[in-house]
């Protein structure tokens, strides 16, 4: 089991990372409202020991890095008089998804949360997310589902395996440009969503996310409108936690995919420009999208510095980003 050296981040909000005056709270009231829909966050009455056993009984696992975290669906059980609201495990269809610490890789929840916040900082829409303390003090990652409304009504959300008739075990097959063409086919705002898609692919490469496979992109049904690219989810810097990872992305940008164990590497500015223009984005717009992310570096570093990562991981993450941003300069 990984022994975590927790960062001393007392009096910091687990949603926005900023200071909290009240030492008894983990969130600002306005931050709790954004994530949980209530001004006081619910309690999570589980720890790693008992939640791992529950996860084995209930939820999926996969061979990907993201999959080493058990994922549990939760709902808020409203407390009675003088009792706190609690998050309880409900099986597959809860309104929240929880990812506790991994026994193999340290700081996965903290890495996923800071990466999601970095995506938001550069204009990428993300699902509502944050960190939450378990009853033993460990941090877990929590996100609110976007495929249902406040009443529990469910909306259709189809991932790229479903939209391209791929089996789940084939989620790494193909190329990103094929997914862009699928978006054009089904989205009500095809070129806007293609642009958003390539921004997310580019961000994933910059941040060392080599696990953005077909199931990590979805189209979400918006009532009275139609399908649009969903907010981003499952953003994790895989290369930060797995030093033996040989791929820079989950799939190539162009072509029909790769065979065998051929590494997916050697991306640079021209690689992304070519992929975007072949998808119908003009050269000028593609170049601006790249510059936009290059200019986010200082924002990203400020978020990393205020995060719950260890000092060592903070420096490693910034170094990884700098290395990739250098390859994007004209």
Model-derived regions, located:
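Anionic ligand-binding catalytic core segments
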Residues: 1-214, 218-330
């Amino acid at each position: 089991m990984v022994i975590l050296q927790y960062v001393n981040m007392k009096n910091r909000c687990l949603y926005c990372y900023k200071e909290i005056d009240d030492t008894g709270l983990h969130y600002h009231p306005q931050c709790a409202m954004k994530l949980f829909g209530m001004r006081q966050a619910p309690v999570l009455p589980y720890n790693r020991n008992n939640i791992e056993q529950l996860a084995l009984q209930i939820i999926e696992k996969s061979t990907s890095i993201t999959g080493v975290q058990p994922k549990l669906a939760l709902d808020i059980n409203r407390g009675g008089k003088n009792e706190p609201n609690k998050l309880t495990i409900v099986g597959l269809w809860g309104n929240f998804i929880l990812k506790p610490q991994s026994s193999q890789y340290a700081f996965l929840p903290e890495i996923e949360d800071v990466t999601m916040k970095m995506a938001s900082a550069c204009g990428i829409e993300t699902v509502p997310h944050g960190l939450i303390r378990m009853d033993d003090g460990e941090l877990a990652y929590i996100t609110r589902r976007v495929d249902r409304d406040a009443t529990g009504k469910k909306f259709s959300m189809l991932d790229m395996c479903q939209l391209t008739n791929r089996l789940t075990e084939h989620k790494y097959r193909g190329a990103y440009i094929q997914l862009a063409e699928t978006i054009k086919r089904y989205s009500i705002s095809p070129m806007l969503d293609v642009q958003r898609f390539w921004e997310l692919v580019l961000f994933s490469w910059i941040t060392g996310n080599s696990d953005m496979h077909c199931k990590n992109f979805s189209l979400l049904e918006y009532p009275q409108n139609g399908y649009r690219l969903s907010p981003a989810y499952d953003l994790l810097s895989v290369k930060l936690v797995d030093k033996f990872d040989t791929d820079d992305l989950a799939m190539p940008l162009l072509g029909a995919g790769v065979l065998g164990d051929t590494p997916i590497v050697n991306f640079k500015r021209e690689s992304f420009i070519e992929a975007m223009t072949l998808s119908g984005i003009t050269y000028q717009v593609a170049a601006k999208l790249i510059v936009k992310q290059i200019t986010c570096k200082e924002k990203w570093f400020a978020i990393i510095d205020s995060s719950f990562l260890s000092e060592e991981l903070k420096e490693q993450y910034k170094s990884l980003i700098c290395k990739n941003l250098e390859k994007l300069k004209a």
